[in-house]
């Protein structure tokens, strides 16, 4: 019966003993020695080849056999030979990828490892970001399997790699060393600017510096993440700076003209211009993320969620957040953003509505009705409903128990701060197909 081996590209090929003999002979010649047939036979007697064995496994056995026969210099030469060929293959694969990427019809088609990334354009920036992804995948898998072996043993570590390769699971941040996503508190930025996270801007002092500084802060944080950056306090802080300039009752005078320039803008127009500056800036691709836009999340609250999270919150001047004006601002932003999306494609922010429930219904009827109204108008956002305001969700899957800070991300302290690393997605379709094919119950 003919024996087949598995090549590096996954194809099967008939096993050839002559190829191994030639490789061993070349290794001896490279160190100025000569391998007789008896020597080669003794070495090969230690190599076991079975049907379906990989090329790498055969070569590993040859290395061990050379060491066992005490041909240490030859074994070293053989190892170096394998390493050079590995490097040559990697360079060849990179060149092949370059050609295929240039010929691809779009960035998703050209992406070999991360086709679902937040990339819209195929250009040099996205190409540069794609090239090292295969190396990051190998590094991430090595670090994680080493940790799995340490905790659970080799069998589970091997099973993890098998499930990845067979597409039963997908690891969201394998192509980067960065954490996947984070929900951050903005308070360190409010009192110290971006200096604590590597920037050089000072704390915001007015509405204009808040808008520009907020965009810079989100870009800096997002450059250190491979996924989303959530800012649950965004509108609360913006509301504070609007109140500093126009008074906490500004929402009652939204039609009042406050701009003495030729534009004669009202308070409402000033606010929507700030919305426009922030949202359109953050939706632009950035070089720090390989020409991807920042993945940005925000949160809205009903009165009870707000009071639970920020009831004891104080701004640097000692003032407390004002719910009435914030409630108006949240609604204004949702209305504006929903209408703006009819004019152009705006992916971010991803919005989450946090509603407290009681006896199976929303506790804050006003915000329950407004949520239904926004859905009726075609707005797209997440809704997180909980009977305990001790829990907060900042995006589609990220949930934080505020009373338990054991799972708290280090960019900030408090109920809104949390994060994730090594996020796994289960491929249910693949699991069901496998179960049906093998007559298993799923």
Stretches found by the model and what they are:
Residues 88, 94-442:
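Conserved catalytic cores of very large enzyme subunits
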């Amino acid at each position: 019966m003919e024996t087949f081996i598995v090549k590096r590209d996954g194809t099967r090929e008939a096993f050839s003993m002559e190829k191994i003999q030639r490789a061993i002979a070349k290794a001896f010649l490279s160190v100025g020695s000569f391998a007789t047939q008896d020597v080669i036979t003794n070495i090969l007697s230690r190599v076991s080849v079975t049907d379906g064995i990989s090329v790498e496994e055969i070569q590993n056995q040859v290395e061990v056999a050379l060491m066992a026969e005490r041909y240490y210099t030859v074994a070293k030469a053989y190892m170096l030979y394998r390493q050079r060929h590995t490097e040559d293959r990697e360079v060849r694969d990179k060149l092949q990828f370059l050609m295929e990427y240039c010929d691809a019809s779009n960035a998703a088609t050209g992406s070999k490892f991360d086709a679902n990334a937040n990339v819209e354009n195929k250009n040099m920036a996205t190409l540069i970001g794609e090239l090292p992804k295969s190396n990051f995948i190998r590094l991430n898998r090595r670090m994680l399997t080493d940790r799995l072996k340490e905790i659970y043993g080799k069998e589970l570590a091997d099973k993890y790699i098998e499930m990845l390769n067979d597409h039963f699971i997908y690891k969201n941040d394998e192509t980067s060393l960065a954490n996947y996503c984070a929900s951050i508190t903005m308070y360190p930025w409010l009192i110290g600017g971006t200096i604590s996270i590597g920037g050089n801007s000072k704390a915001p002092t007015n509405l204009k510096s808040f808008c520009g500084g907020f965009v810079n802060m989100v870009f800096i944080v997002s450059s250190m993440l491979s996924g989303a950056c959530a800012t649950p306090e965004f509108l609360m802080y913006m509301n504070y700076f609007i109140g500093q300039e126009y008074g906490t009752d500004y929402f009652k005078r939204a039609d009042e003209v406050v701009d003495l320039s030729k534009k004669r803008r009202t308070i409402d127009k000033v606010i929507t211009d700030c919305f426009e500056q922030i949202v359109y800036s953050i939706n632009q691709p950035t070089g720090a993320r390989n020409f991807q836009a920042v993945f940005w999340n925000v949160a809205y609250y009903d009165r009870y969620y707000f009071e639970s999270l920020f009831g004891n919150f104080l701004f640097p001047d000692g003032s407390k957040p004002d719910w009435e004006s914030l409630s108006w601002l949240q609604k204004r932003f949702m209305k504006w953003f929903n209408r703006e999306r009819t004019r152009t494609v705006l992916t971010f922010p991803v919005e989450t509505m946090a509603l407290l429930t009681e006896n199976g219904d929303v506790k804050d009827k006003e915000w329950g009705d407004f949520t239904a109204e926004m859905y009726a108008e075609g707005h797209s956002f997440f809704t997180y409903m909980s009977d305990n305001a001790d829990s907060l969700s900042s995006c589609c899957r990220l949930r934080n128990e505020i009373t338990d800070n054991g799972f708290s991300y280090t960019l900030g302290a408090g109920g809104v701060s949390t994060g994730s690393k090594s996020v796994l997605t289960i491929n249910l379709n693949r699991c069901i197909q496998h179960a049906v094919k093998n007559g298993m119950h799923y």
